[in-house]
Amino acid sequence: MRFDLEPPSSTAAAHRIGVLLINLGTPDAPTPRAVRRYLAEFLSDPRVVEIPQAVWQVLLRTLILPLRGRASAKKYAAVWMPEGSPLRVYTERQTDSVRHLLTSNGYHVMVDYAMRYGSPNISHALAQFKRAGVERVLLMPMYPQYSASTTATAFDAAFDALARMRNQPEVRTVRHYADHPAYIHALAEQVRQYWAQHGRPDFAAGDKLVLSFHGVPKRTLDLGDPYHDQCQQTGALLTAALGLSTTECRVTFQSRFGKAEWLQPYTAPTLREFGEAGVRRADVFCPGFTADCLETIEEIGMEVRDEFLAGGGKAFHRIPCLNGAPAWIGALGEIVAENLQGWPVRAAQPETVS
C-alpha cells in the first residue's frame, strides 16, 4: 500500500483537536449529469445496496441512473436554494454555529463538516485536519439513529482515509444519540415553536402528528441493525415530551426504494389513509433528519402532502427539521463536549444556547 504524503514530524506540532460533522451528501448541482454522478457513488456503496455488485452495477448503469437522473434533477431543482443544496447550506450553517459555540466557551478545537457522498468528502476533510496539525479527531455523524447504511458507512470512509495515513490521529466516534435528552429537548422545542406560530393540531378532534423517519429494508432489522428500534425509541421519547398519546402521534418510515419490503408503516400510504378516515389536519415532522433536504422538503412537503389531501385531508403541515434552531445547536455542542472529555480542550463544557 502507498501511504499519503505526510508533513514532517515535529515535537512542536499544534496537537490540535478536530470535530468533523458528517452528513449524507448532495449533488453539486440540480442537473441530470450532477445527479447521476452523485447517485452512482451513493448507490454503489455496498452498505446502502446489499446486492452482489456484479449484478447490481449492470442494473444501476443501464436502467436506474438513466431513468432516475433526469427525474431526480427536477426534484432537486424544485428545492434548490440560492446558496446551493439545502442539505449543504444547512450543514454549513450548523458547522459555523457549533464552531462559534465551542470557541465562545473556550474550546481550542477545529470544527468542519464533510459528506459521505459528493463533496466535500471525508478524506479531504481529514487531510485538511492533518495539515492544520490536528492529532485527535471526533467523528460526529449527523444521524441521530445508528444504521449500517448511514453511520457505519461514514465510519468506513473515515477509516479508509486513515488506512492511507502513516501518522494517524487518535479517533473517537459518536455512534448515536437517539435518546440523548438534549436532542429530544431540541426536537420537542422545534415542534412547540412551530405550533406556537401556526396553531396546535386539534388532537381531540382527531388531528395527527406523524414522525417520519427514513426507511431501510426490513431485512436489515432481521439481520441485527438497531435502526428501527432507535427510531421507535426517539419517537416514544418525543411523544412523551410533547404530552401526546400513541394514537395522536405515529411513527412512520419514508423513501422506500425498490420492491423489497422496508420498515413499516410507510409514510405516504399512512397519510392517505388518515385523509380517507376523515382526519382533517396532519402535521409531519422528520426527527431523523437534522437538516432539511430533498427527502423532507420535496418528498414530505409535496408528495406526501398531495397523498393526504387526495385522501380527503384538509390541512397539511410540514414542520421544518432542526436546521439551525438554537436548542439543536446547543444539543450538538453538548453531545460534542461529552465526547471530547479527557482530551485537552482547555475549557469547560459549553452552555446550551437559549
Swiss-Prot record:
Q: Specify the pathway.
A: Porphyrin-containing compound metabolism; protoheme biosynthesis; protoheme from protoporphyrin-IX: step 1/1
**Subcellular locations according to the entry:** Cytoplasm
According to UniProt, the reaction catalysed is: heme b + 2 H(+) = protoporphyrin IX + Fe(2+)
Per the UniProt record, one Pfam family is Ferrochelatase
| UniProt-listed PROSITE patterns | FERROCHELATASE (PS00534)
Alphabetical UniProt keywords: Cytoplasm, Heme biosynthesis, Iron, Lyase, Metal-binding, Porphyrin biosynthesis
Into which EC class is this enzyme placed? Answer: lyase
Q: Which Gene Ontology BP annotations are present?
A: heme biosynthetic process
Classification via InterPro entries: Ferrochelatase, Ferrochelatase_AS, Ferrochelatase_C, Ferrochelatase_N
Q: Which GO terms describe its cellular component?
A: cytoplasm
Tell me the GO molecular function terms: ferrochelatase activity; metal ion binding
Q: Where does Fe cation bind?
A: H214, E295
Documented EC number(s): 4.98.1.1
Q: Which CDD domains match?
A: Ferrochelatase_C, Ferrochelatase_N
Question: What family does this belong to?
Answer: Belongs to the ferrochelatase family.
Q: According to its UniProt entry, what is the function of this protein?
A: Catalyzes the ferrous insertion into protoporphyrin IX.
Name it.
Answer: Ferrochelatase
Q: Which organism is it from?
A: Burkholderia lata (strain ATCC 17760 / DSM 23089 / LMG 22485 / NCIMB 9086 / R18194 / 383)
